[in-house]
Amino acid sequence: ATVGHYDLGLINKNKNLIQDLKNHKFDIVYLVGQDNLNFEKKDEFIIYQGSHGDNGAELADIILPGSAYTEQDGYFTNLEGKMQKAYKASYPPGESKEDWLIINEIAEYMNNRKLFNDKDELESSMINYLNLQKEKSYEEKIKENNELNEFHNETLKIKMKDYYFSNVIAKSSKTMIECNNSKLNLKSTGTEG
């Protein structure tokens, strides 16, 4: 997700965003699939948009049922910076909708107009933007946003507490729960290797 955010220019220039959240400096917090924030809610009005409802949904005043990544078409950027299209494996259940549709409907409600008329227009707009960005040299991108310097010089730290429960979808999976239980049973016998 981080590489994709950089590609789209969605970069947090406020280094203290999480600290500001913990210090209750926001009136409204909109979480899109964000389930790993660690903070205590005070007076914030929290809107959660997501598929499986973990920590973010527990804090929410309003829940907008979104689709899991397997239930919506989308684009992903790998660590090489290459964009890849992914197609949905199934349709979202019940009242849940694809993320772009929810955001489009909110925009229509607030501004009396949609951001995009359909998914093709959204994809075309995104690809045109990315093509314009590709024309810029690496040096130009760094000059535009000094945050890139810090990103490229960061040490990658992976805190993997439990592979089988590494995200909200895995935590909800019967198969992953069984895998985790098998791992725990091996540890209790001392035969885990």
What are these regions (language model features)?
Residues 123-193:
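Long, low-complexity segments enriched in small/aliphatic residues
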Residues 1-138, 189-193:
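Non-catalytic alpha/beta scaffold blocks inside enzyme catalytic domains
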